[in-house]
From Swiss-Prot:
It comes from the Eukaryota. PANTHER family: HIGH MOBILITY GROUP PROTEIN 2, SWI_SNF-RELATED MATRIX-ASSOCIATED ACTIN-DEPENDENT REGULATOR OF CHROMATIN SUBFAMILY E MEMBER 1-RELATED. It comes from Homo sapiens (Human). This is SWI/SNF-related matrix-associated actin-dependent regulator of chromatin subfamily E member 1-related. Residues 1-17 have a biased composition (Low complexity). InterPro entries: ChromReg_NeuronalGeneExpr, HMG_box_dom, HMG_box_dom_sf. Pfam families: HMG_box. The modification Phosphoserine is found at S160.
């Protein structure tokens, strides 16, 4: 049997006797994907589809975890960025996005506290409204159906891991087994990055405030302890003085009673007045005046007064 001439475009079979379209050719394709890639001039079916890069395509909206749910609020810093970004872009159309963000960050740091508070207040109002809407949404039937669907997707993902691997090896997309459609992949959109930076800045600000408050609290605690010690010391001194005052009052009362009893037998010369507890001071003044007017005449009275005073002093002083 005569063989026809070989076709000009026919390729030689690889070692092992298998054609490229058979299993051996598939192994070669896998090795090329794992290695450095095909040589120059070689084209495979996988070159028709570009290699996927990490991250999320620019401009593509992030998939919502809860469909039809309330939109999450942004911080005051992000509100400021969203308001000022277009103005900066209009004035500087050739300025790249990182430079715009840097300029806005510097502008935010120099912003007056009253202006900052306006954005923070708006963000707080939006946050309160979001929490209210979220609580209402979590009670709805749509939320329950969504959570059930997410749970089913997780179970389906675990069961379809082998099918996903086969799809990747065959070099084409799987409509239902694509990893990006199964997982909620975090994306780095403009809004996401701005919100992340704003949260980090807010955390740094709160940490600084926390440190300042802790220092103030420590100072106030020291002042409080000092004031408490001073108050306790003053209370002790006051109690001591009150005891001393009470003792002196008791001693004074005893002396007045002893003087009243002792001078009861010595009437004032010329008037015959004798002392009582209520009139003791007046009596002693009258007696002193009478003795000063004529000391020589009242020498015996003076001697008696000295004896009484010495006796009272020895008993009560």
């Amino acid at each position: 049997m005569s063989h026809g001439p070989k076709q000009p475009g026919a390729a030689a079979a690889p070692a092992g006797g298998k054609a490229p379209g058979q299993h051996g050719g598939f192994v070669v394709t896998v090795k090329q994907e794992r290695g450095e890639g095909p040589r120059a001039g070689e084209k495979g079916s996988h070159e028709e589809e570009p290699v996927k890069k990490r991250g999320w395509p620019k401009g593509k909206k992030r998939k919502k975890i809860l469909p039809n749910g309330p939109k999450a609020p942004v911080t005051g810093y992000v509100r400021f960025l969203n308001e000022r970004r277009e103005q900066i872009r209009t004035r500087h159309p050739d300025l790249p996005f990182p430079e715009i963000t840097k300029m806005l960050g510097a502008e935010w740091s120099k912003l007056q506290p009253t202006e900052k508070q306006r954005y923070l207040d708006e963000a707080e109002r939006e946050k309160q409204q979001y929490m209210k809407e979220l609580r209402a949404y979590q009670q709805s039937e749509a939320y329950k159906m969504c959570t059930e669907k997410i749970q089913e997707k997780k179970i389906k993902k675990e069961d379809s891991s082998s099918g996903l691997m086969n799809t990747l090896l065959n070099g084409h997309k799987g409509g239902d087994c694509d990893g990006f459609s199964t997982f909620d992949v975090p994306i780095f959109t403009e809004e996401f990055l701005d919100q992340n930076k704003a949260r980090e800045a807010e955390l740094r600000r709160l940490r600084k405030m926390n440190v300042a408050f802790e220092e103030q609290n420590a100072v106030l605690q020291r002042h409080t302890q000092s004031m408490s010690s001073a108050r306790e010391r003053l209370e002790q001194e006051l109690a001591l003085e009150e005891r001393r005052t009470l003792a002196l009052q008791q001693q004074l009362q005893a002396v007045r009673q002893a003087l009243t009893a002792s001078f009861a037998s010595l009437p004032v010369p010329g008037t015959g007045e004798t002392p009582t507890l209520g009139t003791l001071d007046f009596y002693m003044a009258r007696l002193h005046g009478a003795i000063e007017r004529d000391p020589a005449q009242h020498e015996k009275l003076i001697v008696r007064i000295k004896e009484i005073l010495a006796q009272v002093a020895s008993e009560h002083l």
